[in-house]
Amino acid sequence: MSRLKRIAGQDPRAGFKEGGRDCGTSVPQGLLKAARKSGQLNLSGRNLSEVPQCVWRINVDIPEEANQNLSFGATERWWEQTDLTKLIISNNKLQSLTDDLRLLPALTVLDIHDNQLTSLPSAIRELQNLQKLNVSHNKLKILPEEITNLRNLKCLYLQHNELTCISEGFEQFSNLEDLDLSNNRLTTVPASFSSLSSLVRLNLSSNELKSLPAEINRMKRLKHLDCNSNLLETIPPELAGMESLELLYLRRNKLRFLPEFPSCSLLKELHVGENQIEMLEAEHLKHLNSILVLDLRDNKLKSVPDEIILLQSLERLDLSNNDISSLPYSLGNLHLKFLALEGNPLRTIRREIINKGTQEVLKYLRSKIKDDGPSQSESATETAMTLPSESRVNIRAIITLKILDYSDKQATLIPDEVFDAVKSNIITSINFSKNQLCEIPKRMVELKEMVSDVNLSFNKLSFISLELCVLQKLTFLDLRNNFLNSLPEEVESLVRLQTINLSFNRFKMLPEVLYRIFTLETILISNNQVGSVDPQKMKMMENLTTLDLQNNDLLQIPPELGNCVNLRTLLLDGNPFRVPRAAILMKGTAGILEYLRDRIPT
């Protein structure tokens, strides 16, 4: 019998009434018998117009087979049945559900998609264990207020209904991770959605939305946002602060401008095709460090900026059906797997080259650089210089982008000619990543009055020399994927440093010197061997908002870390500690910090 607390109003003798009634041939007794053992019942695609009573009362009535054998020594002990936890009644012809739904309080999964439901019973509020509810592909026009009582719900699928508004109290779904409201008739999204702090995936596509609430940026764990096929004309600038966002879909809207994404460093896919975007500028691109897919098809773009070369991770670029007449030759230096150019009035690339596919187009663009051909946007300005080593330094990047780029050359040292190429130009960024460097190039000191960004990732550095420590204007330092296990005390002189990336090195502790750099806002030190952090010193770092300690050797998390209230992103997954439990980590940074504070000894 059901081991859950008896439902209010239920007959206490119900478990000893004869069962099997009102089932007919629609639900075979063998299926019910198996469900009492497994706790799962699948009645999809049975042409049901209503749910038989024997289903609602599966854990209430005596099963029919018990009438044949009432012996306590029987092999089949019906009284030891399992509570029904999963019920699938999808792909039927149900027009309503009765309040008998409350007779299944142990349900964790209820799947009733693809029916003809116009409403849900108020008794749904009693399914307090429900974690997944699928009511998609029905005819719901409104949701009952009682649905907000389902506080343990993690997945809610409401797509393909006729909803015109969101129920009040929706923000009470504090554990909700996956919400699909696509293909409805929604015109607004309430600001209270921002309280869905656990949400990872939100699908609002194919509605009638004209705007998104600015408060959406409070969804600190959101990774997937789909707003395709709406009426959006602008995107709130606050969206640019969503640091966890990885996939953003804005296709088929009315956007005229591409938003900037200064904080979306994890964004992997940006889909803004089929809008009315007229301009693509450097400001739109320079922060998209992780972008893999960029969809700009069917817009009104007239040009592609030279800064497209900044998207070094880009694999797929769709520029089809725009008004682009020429491409920057630097595009050929990207490692694209797919480039779509159809439907543009290109004058500088022959159709036969485009028809040969992506790699031939890239090869052609690279050949124009090698020929020192003029850029389409300027006259005969030199774009590259060949060094004695036969490698090339991008002069155009130096002049226009203020970047000294000698990356991905597998070089063991940086040739003097690279630094000589700077001449009197202002350089703000250095990129020597993806080489074989064992030490910091000594001539970097020549740029100490200019450089703010340095990327030395993916090298073989085992120590940091003083040449780096004199770059007093440095704000961003990328040292990931090296062999470092310590930082020199002189790093403290980097008084403007805001972001440091030490991931994939050999640190066994958070370098002490970092605690004394009070300008730091972001510390990334995942995938090392860090065994401890000092919460008292970290509390003094009032500007620190992001701390990534994933995949280290932390055996415990000090409760005092909860006092670091300025942290907006704290990542702890992949460590061997037992507390906080995974369920606490799933609540996000605010939940973790609150949990830790509650454990501080008084």
UniProtKB/Swiss-Prot annotation:
Keyword terms of this UniProt record: Leucine-rich repeat, Phosphoprotein, Repeat
Cystine residue pairs: none
InterPro entries linked: Leu-rich_rpt, Leu-rich_rpt_typical-subtyp, LRR_dom_sf, LRR_domain-containing
Phosphoserine: modified positions: 71
GO CC entries: cytoplasm
Positions of LRR repeats: 83-104, 106-127, 129-150, 152-173, 175-196, 198-219, 221-242, 244-265, 266-286, 290-311, 313-335, 336-356, 400-421, 426-447, 450-472, 473-494, 496-517, 519-540, 543-564, 566-586
A Pfam family assignment: LRR_1
Keyword Repeat: yes
Chain residue ranges for the region called Disordered: 1-22
Protein name: Leucine-rich repeat-containing protein 40
Species the sequence originates in: Pongo abelii
